[in-house]
A protein has these predicted regions:
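M16 family metallopeptidases and their MPP-like homologs
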Residues: 48, 53-70, 77-78, 95-145, ...
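Non-catalytic, conformational "gating/processing" segments within enzyme and secreted inhibitor domains
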Residues: 149, 154, 161, 175, ...
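Proteolytic maturation boundary segments
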Residues: 18-47, 234-298, 302, 306-307, ...
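Sec-dependent signal peptide recognition
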Residues: 2-10
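Hydrophobic, small-residue-rich alpha-helical packing segments that form membrane-like cores
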Residues: 156-211, 215-224, 229-230, 235-243, ...
Length: 933
């Protein structure tokens, strides 16, 4: 089943489908468009033709094997084994898998990856070109080797120990440490309580290779494996290849029984407080575990129950949102929902993030809302909105079924194999949902609360900072008991069915039309000077996008109003619009798939919007209201502000925020306009200032350019644009942004900053900044340089040295306010290895300057860029971005002469020359965060 979480549907007029009678007791069939079978050795396969993206395919190896299958001396080796699958197989020694695929533009990390969980390990090769002779066969051979032919050489095992140790270090944050304190209580008496996937560093560093090989032999076997191949392929041909390649793999003799893992039931309520020095929020959760039927065949009754669960969750979410919009919110965030938790178990989760030292108030409030639902259930009006909103989403999904990606299908088949999650295909699910949803009643959904919210198998979990005031077990249980016996009023559902705009709009005529042949688009200038650029694009069948901008942005605001300007976008969106607060507006938009939000950057202001073709008019109505009738709701402002103040109150303890804030100040040379969010920043955010800034920036529509791209008729766009955008006020104001002089420090900046890390690590940041002409040649050269650096650092710092889990490289060129380029390089590592590893960062750069990149690295990078470019052409967003860039920057990036031809003509000598011109003479900021002594 496609998991359209938290959305449900209502029967309305739909495209005509052949009507089927669904019996709830019948088993849900597998999508008939997927070819499936089981080989004699027990391996399962799923093969499907799909063309999103065209000329590409994805290959998945699904292992029903995870961390729960480890012995104590193997703690962490399921994950270790996942790494080893990329470090030598029978047919691809060493880094042969990566090198082979990267030569065809298939990138490690993004297209070549894997994950390990408690119960499964899944490998993927994604977006592999199918037009290259033999590449499909190569990928099948890789899956074949992953099944049974890993080399697991001692040399490669030893080389990978450092990488995984550094992954452990990188992932060891407050959230991870807190979870390791409360999981043993929640899962008491089960194997879930003693495994965390990443494992024990002692085992990682010192296990005997034979121990890893034993785990591999015991569990990587054909009866616990499935492969999924989805893409632009001939299914019959690929199925025959699968039989030929995979059938000879021998089944393991005397195979161990694959255990399932149970969590002991308990009548008493468990309780745990988990604290950490770096934790920034206090959270109270109540988990009620319930065994489910994962791994068993599913009937349509199960599918119906999943819909009921989704309906339930969407309605509870709406109630919590409404609670947080008014007065003084009792908590920062909260939820009361039912969902899947771990394999074999669902959990009813009641969670609230508390205001500082106010856990009692948060717990009582979220338990009160939960008890209100349990006692009184939901109103029919709530249910009808939830159904209608689901229909809108599902109908859009159905119309765009040709845009369901290869990877989405492959992941769906993985879930089907591992847990038997229904996967009937969008056609069957669409038809079934339309038949069953009208039969679901509010009483039926409400009854679920009484089934799910109970006392047994319940655990209270409190997490937060070490020095905060936390509830005791007695206090928490007392609050729950109090709520269960207190008087609670039923929820009253307010209607929201008024029209967005009641007045008649005069609009404006089109005074000039210009064809944009290079984009197959048209530009209209309206009588109020609004510019509208439209391109019909039907790559996404049920989508229309809108982007608008005007020069100015927050650069027009003086320094003392920067905090208000910085928060304007977030707060104005929370106020609602016109006469409607945010909750009323959300109810009014029931059944419409439409979003509009104002945007503010340092140099521009504008709007982002999206809708279906049928909701396009509503999108323009919202734009009109945001211009002409913006809403400024002080109660909503104060409610949101109190949540922000509570949220950041303990952020000063978060090493990640400390580092990010420090870098922000250092890279701006401590410019007075540059500030980071802290209590003083929020103190300077003023409601009246936000109103003033917004009204100053979002006015004079004649200074705005609107881009509309999507699957909608041009005449419809013309009519509605002239009516709504043509009715916007033109103040005949000409303005531009202001260069406020925010620049990086000149020369070389070296800083070593001590940080209190709970888990010792160093964080290295190297940033180069230099003036460079903004043109398409330099934009592409920078992309190629970044790709080459990614490859070099993966090989030298990660693989050869085992020094880090990964080096992240970021790059970009800016045109305004000055033409300038930047390259950022960052990684975590063992503090004792900082200088050695950092020297490799500079060595690789110097090597490119002195010798140029290698042919291999250059060709891999260019191939990847060309592959991604080809895929992007088949999406509406490509044309939206191209049009915007053309107007804003003056470059037609859609023209092959400005991309494909430039890349194909580029040489590694060009990159060597570009690297020299950029790095030599660049400002350098070298910042290392190290643990305090």
């Amino acid at each position: 089943m496609r998991r359209l979480k938290s959305i449900l549907l209502l029967f309305i007029t739909l495209p005509v489908l052949a009507q089927s009678e669904f019996k709830l007791t019948d088993q849900v069939p597998l999508d008939p468009n997927v070819k499936t079978g089981v080989l004699e050795n027990g391996m399962t396969y799923y093969i499907r033709h799909n063309e999103e993206p065209k000329d590409r395919a994805s290959f998945y190896m699904i292992q029903n094997v995870g961390a729960l299958l480890e012995n104590d001396d193997q703690n962490g080796l399921a994950h270790f084994l996942e790494h080893m699958a990329f470090n030598g197989t029978e047919n691809f020694e060493g880094k042969g898998i990566l090198n082979t695929l990267q030569n065809h533009g298939v990138a490690f990390g993004r297209n070549i990856n894997a994950y390990t969980a408690f119960n499964q390990t899944v490998y993927n090769l994604s977006e592999v070109p199918t037009t290259h002779d033999g590449l499909v066969d190569t990928c099948l051979l890789i899956l074949h080797d992953w099944s049974n032919y890993l080399l697991l050489t001692e040399e490669e095992i030893d080389a990978e120990r450092g990488v995984i140790t550094e992954e452990w270090r990188t992932r060891r944050n407050a959230s991870f440490r807190l979870r390791n304190q409360w999981f043993p209580v929640l899962f008491k008496g089960s194997k879930w309580a003693v495994r965390d996937i990443i494992g024990d560093t002692t085992v990682i560093r010192y296990h005997e290779p034979s121990t890893l090989r034993d785990f591999y032999h015991d569990w990587y076997r054909t009866d616990l494996q499935a492969i999924a191949i989805v893409g632009d392929i001939d299914v019959e041909v690929v199925e025959q290849k699968v039989k030929e390649i995979f059938s000879p793999i021998p089944a393991v003799k005397d195979a161990k029984e694959r255990p399932t893992f149970k969590i002991p039931s308990h009548d008493e309520t468990y309780f745990v407080v988990a604290t950490d020095e770096e934790a920034t929020q206090s959270s109270i959760s109540v988990f009620i575990l319930e065994e489910n039927n994962d791994g068993k065949p599913k009937a349509y009754e199960d599918l119906k129950n999943h819909y009921i669960q989704s309906l339930y969750n969407s309605m509870t979410d709406m109630r919590i949102q409404e609670l947080l919009q008014k007065g003084e919110p009792p908590f920062i965030m909260g939820s009361t929902t039912m969902s899947g938790f771990v394999r074999g178990y669902d959990a009813y989760s009641i969670t609230a993030t508390a205001n500082p030292n106010n856990e009692a108030k948060a717990l009582e409030a979220i338990m009160t809302e939960t008890e209100r639902i349990k006692r009184y259930g939901f109103a029919e009006s709530e249910l009808e909105r939830a159904k209608t909103n689901f229909l809108t989403e599902l109908e859009s999904h159905y119309k765009q079924k040709d845009k369901i990606s290869n990877d989405s299908y492959a992941r769906e088949y993985a879930e089907y194999y591992l847990t038997m999650t229904p996967a009937p295909g969008i056609d069957v699910e669409y038809e079934f949902a339309n038949q069953i949803l009208p039969t679901i009643t509010a009483e039926e959904v409400s009854q679920k609360a009484k089934e799910w919210i109970k006392d047994d198998n319940r655990t209270i979990v409190i997490t937060g900072p070490t020095d905060a005031e936390h509830l005791t077990e007695a206090e928490a249980k007392s609050i729950i008991t109090k709520v269960e016996s207190m008087e609670i009023e039923p929820y009253v559902d307010a209607a929201g069915d008024a029209s967005l705009i009641d007045e008649d709009l005069t609009g404006s005529a089109i005074v000039n039309t210009r064809k944009l042949d290079a984009f197959d688009a048209v530009e209209w200038t309206l009588a109020n000077n609004v510019k509208v650029i439209f391109r019909h694009a039907d790559y996404e069948k049920d989508a229309v996008s809108l982007v608008a901008y005007s020069d100015g942005g927050t650069s027009k605001v003086e320094n003392d109003m920067v905090p208000s300007a910085g928060m304007a976008q977030t707060f104005v969106s929370a106020y609602g619009v016109g006469d409607f607060d945010a909750i009323t507006l959300q109810k009014m938009l029931t059944g419409k798939k439409v979003e509009v939000s104002p945007t503010f950057s340092s140099l521009t202001e504008g709007f982002n919007g999206s809708s279906t073709p049928k909701d396009f008019e509503t999108m323009l109505q919202l734009v009109y209201l945001y211009f002409e009738k913006p809403r400024f709701d002080e109660e909503a402002h104060n409610a949101l502000m109190s949540r922000y103040v509570a949220y950041i109150s303990n952020m000063a303890k978060n090493p990640q925020k400390i580092m990010q804030d420090s870098l922000t100040y250092i890279l701006s040379d401590y410019h007075p306009r540059v500030r980071t969010m802290d209590p003083d920043y929020l103190t300077d955010v003023d409601f009246k200032e936000i109103e003033s800034i917004y009204k100053d920036r979002i006015q004079d529509a004649g200074d705005f350019t609107f881009f509309i791209v999507g699957n909608i008729d041009q005449e419809v766009v013309k009519e509605l644009a002239t009516k709504y955008l043509g009715s916007l006020t033109d103040n005949d104001r000409e303005e531009n942004w202001v260069d406020r002089g925010v620049r990086a420090p000149e020369g070389k900046t070296d800083k070593v900053i001590p940080i209190a890390f709970e888990t010792p690590k160093a964080n290295v940041n190297v940033t180069y900044v230099n003036d460079i002409e903004y043109n398409q040649e330099n934009i592409l050269a920078m992309k190629v340089l970044k790709g080459i650096l990614d490859l070099r650092y993966t090989e030298s710092v990660r693989e050869d040295e085992g020094g880090t889990y990964g080096v992240r490289v970021g790059s970009g060129l800016s045109q305004y306010p000055v033409e300038r380029a930047q390259v950022k390089i960052m990684f975590d590592c063992d503090p004792s290895r900082t200088e050695k590893l950092k020297s490799l960062i500079y060595q690789e750069i110097n090597k490119i300057i002195e010798e140029g990149p290698t042919d291999v690295d250059f060709n891999k990078t260019v191939s990847n860029l060309l592959k991604d470019r080809q895929q992007s052409l088949e999406h509406n967003s490509f044309w939206m971005n191209s049009l915007y860039n053309y107007y804003y920057s003056g470059i037609n990036s859609a023209d092959p002469a400005n991309y494909e031809e430039l890349l194909n003509e580029m040489t590694k000598q060009d990159i060597q020359k570009f690297a020299a011109s950029f790095f030599e003479g660049a400002d350098l900021i070298d910042v290392v965060f190290k643990p305090k002594e």
